[in-house]
Amino acid sequence: MAVIGTITVTSAGTAVQNPVSGNCRGIMWRARADNTGAVYVGYSNVSSTNGVHISPGDAFTALFNGYERLESWYADAATNSDKVDFIADNS
């Protein structure tokens, strides 16, 4: 079963926790094409210097050996109000 959601980074430079909880085997992140700048995904300390850089319209997929908690992932952005969508496999 898939879990689908969106994270909106209201304030650039401030990490936003994934609002969905539960286990997953993988997550695909896609930055919205109409974003002004890049988004960054990672753990609670995610930033432009240590997160996975995703340009507007691009995607990044993380696959795990076993399960990872969805709420352990965060997003940050270079620009206020940019969004990143995600789909996670929790089967």
Kindly label every feature range from the protein language model.
Residues 81-91:
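Exposed low-complexity, polar/acidic, P/S/T/G-rich flexible segments that act as propeptides
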Residues 18, 24, 29-35, 77:
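Asparagine-centered strand-capping/turn motif at beta-strand->loop junctions
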Residues 7-17, 49-66:
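Short, solvent-exposed S/T- and G/P-enriched segments that are highly enriched in secreted/extracellular
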Residues 25-27, 65-82:
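Noncatalytic modules at the cell exterior or secretory-pathway interfaces
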